[in-house]
């Protein structure tokens, strides 16, 4: 069962006819697209990934380029969930990993409920179309609107890593799955754009409050045969927003590109 809490007073939220309500009568309407906004002061400017990044990621991932990694995440998630599981996808984006995880849990003969949290309303609008079985919230990974010790598993797939908050919402002995880029991930994309590309720095894996159970690596080479897919890959990464117009033109002019994918997946258990 997904146990949401009020972002104002931390009281338990109940779904009552199209809105979530806490005992102190703080009320949060459910949008037509199916998510509830639990981000305080969310009217003050744009939050999270913008429409260009979200659409680029959706278009790129829906073409199957990351399927090997998505399957690895889903299989690991299903392996480490109990028979009846509540899974939190912290930074769920447009929901492609969330859906794969739910399907893998069902395939393993288990039952899962999935809560997707993202700070981007645009991303959740797309996520709501993936499956009617998601519970979706606009919220920050740093302030999850989830009751203490109520989640069996947390997914952290290329989103802000906030271990103290993940430890708070996880049950004792629950699992955290964290994705991170390996040294050579997307090297050829960086070499296309930058004169002096750099390796990805190593990711520190020791995390207070958690025991590292194991790490897994997934590698692949994808071949992009049209400019549309090259631009989608570029625009779904932070590189696009850190690159000047002159270097962006290199991606805009490229017609084909082979790119190495190199993912790490760290599996932790809450102490």
What is each of the regions a protein language model found here?
Residues 1-47:
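N-terminal auxiliary segments of SAM/dcSAM-dependent transferases
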Residues 46-72, 76:
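Class I SAM-dependent methyltransferase Rossmann-like catalytic core
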């Amino acid at each position: 069962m997904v146990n949401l809490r009020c972002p104002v007073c931390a009281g338990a939220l109940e779904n009552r006819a199209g809105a979530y309500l806490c005992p102190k009568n703080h009320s949060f309407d459910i949008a037509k697209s199916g998510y509830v906004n639990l981000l305080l002061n969310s009217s003050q400017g744009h939050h999270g990934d913008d429409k260009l990044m979200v659409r680029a990621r959706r278009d790129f991932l829906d073409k199957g380029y990351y399927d090997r990694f998505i399957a690895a995440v889903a299989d690991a998630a299903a392996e480490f969930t109990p028979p009846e599981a509540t899974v939190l996808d912290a930074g769920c984006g447009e929901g492609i990993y969330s859906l794969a995880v739910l399907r893998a849990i069902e395939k393993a003969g288990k039952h899962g409920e999935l809560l997707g949290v993202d700070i981007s309303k645009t991303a959740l609008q797309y996520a709501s179309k993936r499956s009617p079985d998601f519970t979706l919230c606009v919220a920050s990974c740093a302030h999850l609107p989830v009751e203490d010790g109520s989640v069996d598993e947390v997914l952290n797939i290329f989103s802000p890593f906030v271990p103290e908050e993940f430890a708070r919402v996880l049950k004792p002995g629950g699992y955290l799955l964290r994705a991170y880029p390996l040294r050579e991930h997307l090297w050829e994309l960086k070499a296309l754009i930058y004169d002096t590309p750099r390796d990805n720095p190593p990711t520190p894996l020791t995390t207070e409050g958690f025991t590292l159970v194991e790490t897994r690596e997934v590698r692949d080479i994808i071949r992009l045969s049209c400019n549309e897919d090259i631009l989608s890959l570029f625009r779904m990464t932070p590189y696009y927003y850190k690159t000047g117009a002159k270097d962006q033109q290199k991606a805009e002019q490229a017609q084909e590109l082979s790119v190495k994918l190199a993912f790490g997946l760290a599996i932790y258990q809450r102490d």
